[in-house]
């Protein structure tokens, strides 16, 4: 029998370093929970656990907690169209399309600068593919945006998921270009805002401290007061979408 697990319990106190020095935190306290969630998120990223996750057979590369929160958002918001930049293997597209299939409405537009042949084949042969349209091109190019707009009717509600190039400048450009598609009450979700948290990780980069999607979101919110962070979708604590669920408020609200 593992004595640590089934016999003597490990110490419930852990030490953390703060600006004021070292302090002990009870792991069962709210403060301790926040510390453990932060450590788990960072270690999870370094060990690439999100790469172990699939949705209906397709790799999705997202935290299970974020998948649950996105599911909840789609069910509550029920957009007519979801636009995603950053197709990768296509798992997220299949997630959105399968939820829309259950809801009996809606479709998904996936945008990527390069959609590899085997990924396209996996997506287009999937049972959820009838609700998916793929557009190959840079998400910030005018021609790509025109192709996206041409597939959206004027009266349709739109949700946007940004998960492509994660530099500050690119994400900011995406936010500026795709925000007009989202009406009052609609959402933009920005992924991979974990980057500044893992800038010091073995697989991270020091430049991520400033060059990351979270910085782009802060820049965008400073100039677009009609959008706000909906922190209710971060309540599971472990997330790659810190301040990433952006809700467009009603005009003059």
Q: Language-model features: where?
A:
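Polar low-complexity intrinsically disordered regions
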Residues: 1-9, 217, 251-253
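N-terminal auxiliary segments of SAM/dcSAM-dependent transferases
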Residues: 2-37
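Generic surface-pattern signal
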Residues: 21, 30, 38-46, 144, ...
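Membrane-proximal envelope and lipid/glycan-remodeling enzymes
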Residues: 22-26, 45, 156-159, 170
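Class I SAM-dependent transferase core
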Residues: 34-62
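S-adenosylmethionine/decaboxylated-SAM
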Residues: 56-58, 64-253
């Amino acid at each position: 029998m593992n004595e640590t697990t089934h016999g003597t319990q490990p110490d419930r106190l852990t030490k953390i370093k703060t600006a004021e020095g070292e302090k002990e935190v009870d792991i069962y306290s709210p403060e301790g929970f926040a510390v453990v969630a932060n450590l788990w998120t960072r270690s999870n990223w370094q060990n690439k656990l999100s790469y172990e996750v699939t949705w209906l057979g397709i790799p999705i590369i997202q935290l299970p907690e974020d998948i649950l929160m996105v599911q909840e958002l789609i069910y509550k918001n029920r957009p007519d169209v979801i636009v995603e930049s950053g197709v990768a293997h296509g798992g997220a597209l299949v997630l959105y399309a399968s939820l829309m299939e259950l809801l009996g409405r809606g479709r998904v537009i996936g945008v990527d600068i390069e959609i590899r042949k085997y990924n396209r084949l996996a997506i287009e042969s999937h049972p959820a593919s009838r609700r998916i349209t793929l557009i190959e091109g840079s998400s910030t190019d005018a021609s790509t945006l025109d192709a996206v707009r041409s597939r959206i009717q004027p009266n349709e509600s739109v949700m946007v998921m940004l998960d492509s190039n994660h530099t500050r400048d690119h994400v900011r450009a995406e936010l500026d270009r795709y925000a007009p598609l989202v009406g009052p009450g609609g959402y933009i979700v920005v992924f991979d805002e974990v980057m500044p948290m893992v800038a010091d990780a073995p697989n991270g980069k020091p430049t991520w401290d400033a060059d990351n999607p979270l910085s782009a979101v802060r820049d965008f919110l400073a100039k677009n007061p009609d959008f706000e962070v909906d922190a209710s979708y971060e309540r599971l604590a472990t997330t790659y979408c810190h301040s990433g669920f952006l809700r467009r408020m009603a005009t003059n609200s």
